[in-house]
């Protein structure tokens, strides 16, 4: 397989929500802070600054547990309207350099600068310029990864944080990828990482030597993706109009619940809100599955899904009942429902996919 090599920049804002709060409220600087819900309402941390991370505080951690790790932690309520406003400023900066922008969230995006003529066409210099402009306009710092393919750019953006950047040039891919932990590959979480470790695979180099047929047999379609990523191959183009893949709603409960009847008391509001969100953000889109998610009081979670072409309230309740079979006496602290959205043809990637290594002057 011939790799599609481009000049990809992955921009990742540093502690974004927390950084905005420290910018707007200077008295918070130098103190451990986290943006998230109150502990007495069983809130969850959205993000935290580096001072808090030094105590082990992390995103998606229960606020109460975070306070046990860091008793002096300052919990700040989120201001989503402000974060969205600043994110729009950042995207305006991206647009000065390329139209090929794929936002991943408010604080993260891929940029394809292959055709950009600014900064002598150097992706490294373009990333530096973008980061400098972000700081001048917003007062916030960003980190960047520069590479010929998307997933390596994302990996690279994490290697010189905060307020730094890392470059992986085409001739570096082979040596860089050999020692890269498989857990750095997007999609390889704790469960898949453990499965790979159980067969003796922890690095991309080790996976390269493993029989491809066995990987595909064990991991199916994702096995093929693993084989490609372990060789530094990622043919995905930047998708400026990236389709939403799912719509969901969940709630963290004020108190643990334990029975199916108690869950039934929560479901109607969730399903109603899901329908409203579908109308707002996925109107006209077909669905391909329904999902129910539970998080227990030991913070482990389970999801059950079923293929579905049309949203069915009855199916949500059936999936809920199946989910509770995994409860094992644990209290339920979070309940969620979601739908997967069927893909639509994306005509914007065809032109981008025509760019091949032989056609590029890759000045990194």
UniProtKB/Swiss-Prot annotation:
It is found in: Cytoplasm. Belongs to the DNA polymerase type-Y family. Poorly processive, error-prone DNA polymerase involved in untargeted mutagenesis. Copies undamaged DNA at stalled replication forks, which arise in vivo from mismatched or misaligned primer ends. These misaligned primers can be extended by PolIV. Exhibits no 3'-5' exonuclease (proofreading) activity. May be involved in translesional synthesis, in conjunction with the beta clamp from PolIII. Binds 2 magnesium ions per subunit. HAMAP family: DNApol_IV (MF_01113). This is DNA polymerase IV. Gene3D superfamilies: 3.30.70.270, 3.40.1170.60, 5' to 3' exonuclease, C-terminal subdomain (1.10.150.20), DNA polymerase, Y-family, little finger domain (3.30.1490.100). The keyword Repeat does not apply.
